[in-house]
């Protein structure tokens, strides 16, 4: 199966491969432009766009493969755009009710990039690019966006969860993390 999605000024191919192993289905997103190579982090300036593409592709392919998850667990900045995109997809009944969890493994890496580059790559409304959403000290922050829009925020341990709510370890996001504590 495949579809095409809008990425900035062009359409990008989204292929999906399915593998069933021990009764569990795995899906793999395919795209030669973004994923042709032997390293997941290849070209630093393309990484943000690559993971924005991946996040949008994950959600966009779901109706095609007829898979509607109850919860999507997003890990670090690389999948931070998923909860943001999911919010933009809410006019489509297929996506209504899907929940997200944003899991933080290392707060040091936030997917912080040039504001205009992210805005262009994501192709979403200005509404999402304010200081209470994706904007972060005049840049755009993909992890912050995921944290704002996810239904829940989790970390790798309760100790880490407490540490990152402090100014010392919160990497500038401690107030948001305090507000999202459950």
Regions found by a protein language model. Give the residues of each.
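Catalytic cores of nucleotide-sugar-dependent glycosyltransferases that transfer UDP/GDP/TDP-activated
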Residues: 1-182
